Curated annotation (Swiss-Prot):
BP GO terms, sorted: apoptotic mitochondrial changes; canonical glycolysis; cellular response to leukemia inhibitory factor; establishment of protein localization to mitochondrion; fructose 6-phosphate metabolic process; glucose 6-phosphate metabolic process; glucose metabolic process; glycolytic process
Major enzyme class: transferase
UniProt-recorded name of the protein: Hexokinase-2
Residues carrying N-acetylmethionine: M1
Taxonomic placement: Eukaryota, Metazoa, Chordata, Craniata, Vertebrata
Assembly behavior: Monomer. Interacts with TIGAR; the interaction increases hexokinase activity in a hypoxia- and HIF1A-dependent manner.
Entry GO MF terms: ATP binding; D-glucose binding; fructokinase activity; glucokinase activity; hexokinase activity
Species whose genome carries this gene: Equus caballus (Horse)
Top-level taxon of origin: Eukaryota
Length: 917
């Protein structure tokens, strides 16, 4: 008993000593985490070189665009063919993908041989043979009458220029078909099919096996965005942001990059990591100096590395008593499967003995222990190197997405990963150690090269179908120049109807006289109060206007809220509250009891009979104070002042915010004769000739007309421009059938139009994987500010996704592109419609004055104009295009509703004083 324990102890110690000896000898092959992180850092740099246009030509890691722009989302369906050519045999497959709530993939395939004479013959012979095999397969399945989409896995070095265009760089794997290198493989296969003439197919996609692996796994797990192969060769691909791929035009979305990482180190980057054994393998290979990383990690070289180490150690008399057999001295005799078997057996030492005996050796126990340990070190290094480069890829994706913690899946294929007993586990553990801030799942690919090609095709088909469907839906929102000219013409007609006494009553564009008959001339001076009431908050302002050398405007203001019970109470309560706030402001400014001229910006629909008389037609914006509609708001304000008996005010002018905007800008620019607001709502005003304002007596001079153009189209004159989405937004609004033009182009409604389009797309499976969230059903979630943010040029798609997530909408990268596209189309139409309306206004001014050309400035205010990244530019371009005889400048207003009311009051006081003199 004691003897057997002693013997076991002796062997354990012996083994331990031998392992230590090998570990010491192969010290440089055992890589610390510190070294692996350094390799990872170097690989990141190489990736960046491959992506950048300037360094791509000399980069060793080529980072080739694959033109695969999306991974599966699980809604793919249809029948597809796949060709898989990567060796002496090739396969034809029929892949049926169903999506009836249960994702299912059915495959039938047949393997065909490629005879040596065809591999070495002409390209025509090779592709005729492939087309013949394809015909045979389709015959058997009786599908020759169908024109099916086909994906082609072509595992040879290619330069891809489109998804369905791929130029062969050079043959490998024993192929030498003449006249193929440098040519597009897809064209060659198409021509071969045409020569036959007995069937037709639609070649949609050319992919390599790594991409196919990612796509296969992507169908089962939508987080899969990396493909990895570790077999006879090694490579990886991943989904990169388009904005970083300099070699392809476009910044939107993502594209799969075929890294060709086997060439990492070809420029000397890994020279300090490579050992003498790596150098020896390279020198004896078919392609010295190339694919150096692959030679350190892939199955083609793993067994050979072990053999070279054994030979060197034997020559140094560290193994086999210094003796070597001819078999062990023969390249390729120690295979990678031997490495797997030695490491896989419970008694790996015994397996090592069997392999060594097969190779004509007579090993001792120590030799077998050493061989087992060498296999472990070589395969562990392979897994570690693989993990280092994968860590770089994961870190890059994480940074691209701007996420604190990345959740991602890696689709993996290849004999080393699948068949080596410990490779997968070692790789996974090392990756998780190197990138602890990533949650990584490894998914084994089942038939990546066949099913994957079909999946790329299925995704391309889905994207193409969805793109066509979306284009068709968005088409009515894209207005041609002719359509915009027609909108301009109709606006002019409606303006004439609003000005005419005869048609005014039935005209939707009311063209209301404002009794503002002059713009500022710069001589205005004095202190004025201004009230600005247009929502749940209102402002009281003191505006000091100076002329002469100190010309300018100085403002002080205070904001007060209007509680809901007052908004919904009586008119007396509302105006008493307003007067209370004025009293508070005067006390705050140290002006208690002072009587000043007052301008009142009152942004509700009114009929104005004088500058200081304005009849409220109806409350909007949530106000419901009783006893106000049909009453003069100036009288209501004066009565409230008298009730308080604390101060008196001279109410000189009631104005709306559009006129205030024109006057504010008119103070800065004497050419300003038009006011425009494009914010939550939209309206315009302009200086009209008095002779055309039939509702007011007098022919001389000009008067500002408040167009109230938001109601353009309320008589049905825009029905042919209204889409189903405009109709839906109108029907669910607080005022159906009213303000139709405003509902097509103002900030309050653009988000709702977008939301309705997104719901339509989702219902039809074109967006959000066909899943409508409760959040998307919620009216009003798409505020104008989100549209502005989403369309911002400096915003990456990840940030668009973040905005959508904030709105409770889980989206993919593709979804983000679509949402951005919808926002762009809706906002562009809004800007163009606004431009068409403005073109009608400035052209009318020009024609009124009988001018060939008009120079005019438009004062503009409103969040949509000021904050949206493209609205202003598109609108200005539209005006320029539709009113070419007008030289129109746009001046942004600063506080039109407050400062503007004071300036109207100042102008009125100036004119009144001049009249008194």
């Amino acid at each position: 008993m004691i003897a057997s324990h002693l013997l076991a102890y002796f062997f354990t110690e012996l083994n331990h000593d031998q392992v230590q000896k090998v570990d010491q000898y192969l010290y440089h092959m055992r890589l610390s985490d510190e070294t692996l992180l350094e390799i990872s850092k170097r690989f990141r740099k190489e990736m960046e070189k491959g992506l950048a246009a300037t360094t791509h030509p000399t980069a060793s890691v080529k980072m080739l665009p694959t033109f695969v722009r999306s991974t599966p989302d699980g809604t793919e369906h249809g029948e597809f063919l796949a060709l898989d050519l990567g060796g002496t045999n090739f396969r034809v497959l029929r892949v049926r993908v169903t999506d009836n709530g249960l994702q299912k993939v059915e495959m039938e395939n047949q393997i065909y041989a490629i005879p040596e004479d065809i591999m070495q013959g002409s390209g025509t012979q090779l592709f005729d043979h492939i087309a013949g095999c394809l015909a045979n397969f389709m015959d058997k399945l009786q599908i020759k009458d169908k024109k099916l989409p086909l994906g082609f896995t072509f595992s040879f070095p290619c330069i891809q220029t489109k998804l369905d265009e791929s130029f062969l760089v050079s043959w490998t794997k024993g192929f030498k078909s003449r006249g193929v290198e440098g040519r597009d493989v897809v064209t060659l296969i198409r021509k071969a099919i045409q020569r036959r003439g007995d069937f037709d197919i639609d070649i949609v996609a050319m992919v390599n096996d790594t991409v196919a692996t990612m796509m296969t796994c992507g169908y089962d797990d939508q987080n899969c965005e990396i493909g990895l192969i570790v077999g006879m060769g090694s490579n990886a691909c991943y989904m990169e942001e388009m904005r970083y791929i300099d070699t392809v035009e476009g910044d939107e979305g993502r594209m799969c990059i075929n890294m060709e990482w086997g060439a990492f180190g070809d420029d000397g980057t890994l020279d300090d990591i490579r050992t003498e054994f790596d150098q020896e393998i390279d020198m004896g290979s078919l392609n010295p100096g190339q694919q150096l990383f692959e030679k350190m990690i892939s199955g083609m070289y793993m067994g050979e590395l072990v053999r070279l180490i054994l030979v060197k150690m034997a020559k140094e008399e560290l193994l086999f008593r210094g003796k070597l057999s001819p078999e062990l001295l023969t390249t390729g005799r120690f295979e990678t499967k031997d490495v797997s078997e030695i490491e896989g057996e419970k008694d790996g030492i015994q397996k090592a003995r069997e392999v060594l005996v097969r190779l004509g050796m007579d090993p001792t126990q120590e030799d077998c222990v050493a061989t087992h340990r060498i296999c472990q070190i070589v395969s562990t290094r392979s897994a570690s190197l693989c993990a280092a480069t994968l860590a770089a890829v994961l870190q890059r994706i994480k940074e691209n997405k701007g996420e604190e913690r990345l959740r991602s899946t890696i689709g993996v294929d290849g004999s080393v990963y699948k068949k080596h007993p410990h490779f997968a586990k070692r790789l996974q553990k090392t990756v998780r150690r190197l990138v602890p801030n990533c949650d990584i799942r490894f998914l084994c690919s089942e038939d990546g090269s066949g099913k994957g090609a079909a999946m790329v095709t299925a995704v391309a088909y889905r994207l193409a179908y969805q793109h066509r469907a979306r284009l068709k839906t968005l088409e009515p929102l894209k207005l041609s120049r002719e359509q915009l000219l027609e909108v301009k013409r109709r606006m002019k007609v409606e303006m004439e109807r609003g000005l005419s006494k005869e048609t005014h009553a039935s005209a939707p564009v009311k063209m209301l006289p404002t009794y503002v008959c002059a713009t500022p001339d710069g001589t205005e001076k004095g202190d004025f109060l201004a009230l600005d009431l247009g929502g749940t908050n209102f402002r009281v302002l003191l505006v000091r206007v100076r002329n002469g050398k100190r010309r300018g405007v100085e403002m002080h203001n205070k904001i007060y809220s209007i509680p809901q019970d007052i908004m919904h109470g009586t008119g007396d309560e509302l105006f008493d509250h307003i007067v209370q706030c004025i009293a508070d402001f005067l006390e705050y400014m140290g002006m208690k009891g002072v009587s000043l001229p007052l301008g009142f910006t009152f942004s509700f629909p009114c009929q104005q009979n004088r500058l200081d008389e304005s009849i409220l037609l109806k409350w909007t914006k949530g106000f419901k104070a009783s006893g106000c509609e049909g009453e003069d708001v100036v009288t209501l304000l004066k009565e409230a002042i008298h009730r308080r008996e604390e101060f008196d005010l001279d109410v000189v002018a009631v104005v709306n915010d559009t006129v205030g905007t024109m006057m504010t800008c008119g103070y800065e620019d004497p050419h300003c004769e038009v006011g425009l607001i494009v914010g939550t709502g939209s309206n315009a005003c302009y200086m009209e000739e008095m002779r055309n304002v039939e509702l007011v007596e007098g022919e001389e001079g000009r008067m500002c007309v408040n167009t109230e153009w938001g109601a353009f189209g309320d008589n049905g004159c825009l029905d042919d421009f209204c889409t189903e989405f405009d109709v839906a937004v109108d029907e669910l609004s607080l005022n159906p059938g009213k303000q139709r033009f405003e509902k097509m182009m103002s900030g309050m409604y653009l988000g709702e139009i977008v939301r309705n389009i997104l719901i339509d797309f989702t219902k039809r499976g074109l967006l959000f994987r066909g899943r409508i969230s409760e959040r998307l059903k919620t009216r009003g979630i798409f505020e104008t500010k989100f549209l502005s943010q989403i369309e911002s040029d400096c915003l990456a798609l990840q940030q668009v996704r973040a905005i959508l997530q904030h709105l409770g909408l889980e989206s993919t990268c593709d979804d983000s592109i679509i949402v951005k596209e919808v926002c762009t189309v809706v906002a562009q139409r809004a800007a163009q419609l606004c431009g068409a309306g403005m073109a009608a206004v400035v052209d009318k001014i020009r024609e009124n004055r009988g001018l060939d050309t008009l120079k005019v400035t438009v004062g503009v205010d409103g969040t949509l104009y000021k904050l949206h990244p493209h609205f202003a530019k598109v609108m200005r371009e539209t005006v320029k295009d539709l009113a070419p005889k007008c030289d129109v400048s746009f001046l942004e207003s600063e506080d039109g509703s407050g400062k503007g009311a004071a300036l109207i009051t100042a102008v009125a006081c100036r004119i009144r004083e001049a009249g008194q003199r």
